């Protein structure tokens, strides 16, 4: 790996494919450098984890209900004993509305992507076609050096 990496290849491939699967060294640090380069190139980044996402399509693009952890407490009403359902706005729409005027778009960077199912990965592969301002980067696993490929190719390999 080069001593100083500009990140131009990653940015070029992200704009070309729309969704990338990355393999990062397990000691970490490299993904932060590439996120910084994406921000310097005019993108806004949203860093989330794949664990606990639930229905990925609903979480990202639709109003969805969540229940807070009940911590052993029961509600006194006649509803479910696990608590009230709170409805949250779609996370992508909320962030796209807040983009600066000169921003190139939103990069959704998902860590721990190895736990996502093939259907979820297929949806995330097609997400940049549904919303052109959104690009997707998913950490698919570890490697000795930081490398990336189109998310569609990582889907075929799994």
Swiss-Prot record:
Its source organism is: Nostoc punctiforme (strain ATCC 29133 / PCC 73102)
InterPro entries, sorted: NAD(P)H-quinone_OxRdtase_su_N (IPR020874)
Q: What does this chain do?
A: NDH-1 shuttles electrons from an unknown electron donor, via FMN and iron-sulfur (Fe-S) centers, to quinones in the respiratory and/or the photosynthetic chain. The immediate electron acceptor for the enzyme in this species is believed to be plastoquinone. Couples the redox reaction to proton translocation, and thus conserves the redox energy in a proton gradient. Cyanobacterial NDH-1 also plays a role in inorganic carbon-concentration.
Q: List the membrane topology term(s).
A: Peripheral membrane protein
Query: Quaternary structure?
Result: NDH-1 can be composed of about 15 different subunits; different subcomplexes with different compositions have been identified which probably have different functions.
Give a Gene Ontology cellular component term annotated to this protein: plasma membrane-derived thylakoid membrane
Q: List the PANTHER family hit by this protein, alphabetically.
A: NAD(P)H-QUINONE OXIDOREDUCTASE SUBUNIT N, CHLOROPLASTIC
Q: Which reaction does it catalyse?
A: a plastoquinone + NADH + (n+1) H(+)(in) = a plastoquinol + NAD(+) + n H(+)(out); a plastoquinone + NADPH + (n+1) H(+)(in) = a plastoquinol + NADP(+) + n H(+)(out)
> What is the annotated localization of this protein?
Cellular thylakoid membrane
Keyword tags:
Membrane, NAD, NADP, Plastoquinone, Quinone, Thylakoid, Translocase, Transport
**Under what name is this protein listed?**
NAD(P)H-quinone oxidoreductase subunit N
């Amino acid at each position: 790996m080069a001593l100083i990496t500009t990140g131009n290849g990653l940015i070029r491939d992200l704009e070309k494919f729309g969704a990338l699967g990355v393999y990062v060294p397990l000691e970490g640090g490299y993904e932060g450098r590439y996120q910084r380069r994406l921000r310097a190139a005019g993108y806004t980044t949203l860093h989330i984890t794949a664990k606990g996402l639930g229905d990925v399509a609903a979480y990202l693009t639709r109003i969805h209900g969540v229940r807070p952890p009940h911590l052993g407490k029961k509600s006194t009403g006649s509803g479910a004993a696990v608590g009230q359902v709170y409805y949250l706005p779609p996370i992508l729409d909320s962030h796209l509305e807040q983009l600066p005027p000169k921003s190139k778009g939103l990069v959704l960077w998902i860590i721990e992507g190895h736990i996502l199912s093939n259907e979820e990965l297929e949806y995330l592969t097609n997400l940049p076609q549904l919303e052109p301002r959104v690009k997707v980067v998913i950490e698919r696993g570890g490697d000795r050096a930081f490398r990336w490929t189109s998310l569609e190719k990582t889907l075929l390999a799994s």
